[in-house]
Amino acid sequence: MKSTVFFVLMVFELINTASGSHFLGGTITWRIVNASATGSPVSVVITQTYSWLYGLITCTNAMIAGSQLIGVGVFTNLYSTYLNCVANCGNDSRGYIAPNVVPHCTDVSAYLSTTIGQRSDTVNLEVDDDFAAAFKSNAWRTLTLFTGTGSWSISTRITIKKRSDNGLYNNAPVATMMSPLNIPVLKPTIINVPIADMDGDIIRCRWSTSNTTGVDECGGVCPPDSLPINTVIYPNCTIIITGPVVGNWFAV
């Protein structure tokens, strides 16, 4: 059975220096707790992983050891920000209670100016639910190319339907790359995005758009406008990109 990376929006940056606002990208994935479950509700684990600018979003080794939430600093609005339903809400998202987006501190590098956090939440959904949820905001670190205010929208589509080939619930494929990435200036670089599917399906990358069945998947950083001229993105999850100027940042 073929599948596409439709459920996961992976956002990453290509970087030479670090400065500016606090968000560096992230991923949202989900999996069925018991693929052979019968009846409702169906338990689903949603995992959010985000990368932030170190110094503005706090993480320490002690916080990692204590499984503490990241320190949001002046960005206290994050405490009231949730992974809200953004499409097919209501009858197609029965039982969904949106989790908060503030993650537990998992990794930190002062040298790379990066804080990474992750959280997993279990939600109980109804059979045949099919909806999209997203983390939306507008505090990207300074980017070279973007539209509007440089907002982001990291979305995931959650579908609670059994497969026709084996009668089990399907799990979402995942992309496991985190930002930021470094690329050399004026040299074409091939980036292969790591992807996996726990059901063993053949998967491809469908790159995000601003209006996929009514869902904004990328905000102000939708490709190709967010990338340098002559960047090529392929459905096999490969990007060929050339950084034109030292210090440029791009998002996809």
What residue ranges belong to the model's regions?
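Long, compositionally biased, intrinsically disordered segments
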Residues: K2-V252
